[in-house]
Regions:
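Alpha-helical protein-protein interaction elements
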Residues: 15-16, 33, 57, 61-64, ...
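A short, hydrophobic secondary-structure junction motif
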Residues: 15, 19, 23, 42-52, ...
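Generic, low-specificity signal for short hydrophobic/alpha-helical stretches with a mild N-terminal bias
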Residues: 2-5, 19, 43, 47, ...
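A short linear-motif detector with a strong N-terminal bias
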Residues: 3-5, 18, 25-27, 55-57, ...
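Short secondary-structure boundary micro-motifs
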Residues: 8-10, 29-31, 37-38, 66-69, ...
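Short, low-complexity N-terminal intrinsically disordered segments enriched in polar/charged residues
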Residues: 1-39
Length: 162
């Protein structure tokens, strides 16, 4: 592989990983909008939730995430250890995720009594290149473990969202 080919590969892998890091930064910063969703996901994209339910298409992804994340005062997603494999105009991605969620009914001041939950897992994604831009076409979240308050509420929320 030539140096130019190596540089192109590094740039494309960075473009793909940026899709996830920028998307979840928008979620955590509470500035998610439909333009960010459309810049991240393809028109037929699927998000597969931990319970197996799916959101398909940018509008459904946007509405589903706005509804889901409205339950939290704050979230913080740490996404690491990206492995990206590119084959022509398709790619796969694997990364680890630690997701922190502070329930909306908490006080504004930090407290030892705050209700929260943490989830660790693995993101598995597929991406496609549309024109010159990479977009996520599928994103799954395999939760390895969870801890904290409100796990029953989370499971009930996903059941009601189906």
């Amino acid at each position: 592989m030539t140096t130019d080919e190596q540089i192109k590969l590094i740039v494309e892998k960075t473009q793909i990983t940026d899709l996830l890091t920028r998307y979840f930064a928008a979620v955590d910063d509470k500035r998610l909008d439909i333009q960010i969703v459309k810049a991240t996901f393809s028109n037929e994209a699927r998000i597969i939730r931990p319970d197996g339910s799916e959101m398909i298409g940018p509008e459904n992804i946007f509405e589903g995430h706005i509804k889901s994340f409205a339950r939290f005062k704050a979230t913080h997603h740490v996404i690491t250890n990206f492995i990206v494999d590119i084959h022509d105009n398709k790619a796969t991605l694997r990364s680890n995720v630690i997701a922190n969620h502070l329930w909306a009914d908490n006080d504004d001041a930090p407290s030892l009594n705050n209700k929260y939950f943490l989830a660790d897992g693995v993101f598995s994604a597929k991406a496609i290149k549309i024109d010159k831009y990479w977009r996520i076409s599928e994103l799954g979240n395999n939760v390895i473990w969870r801890t904290g308050d409100g796990m029953k509420e989370m499971l009930n929320f996903f059941k009601q969202s189906k």
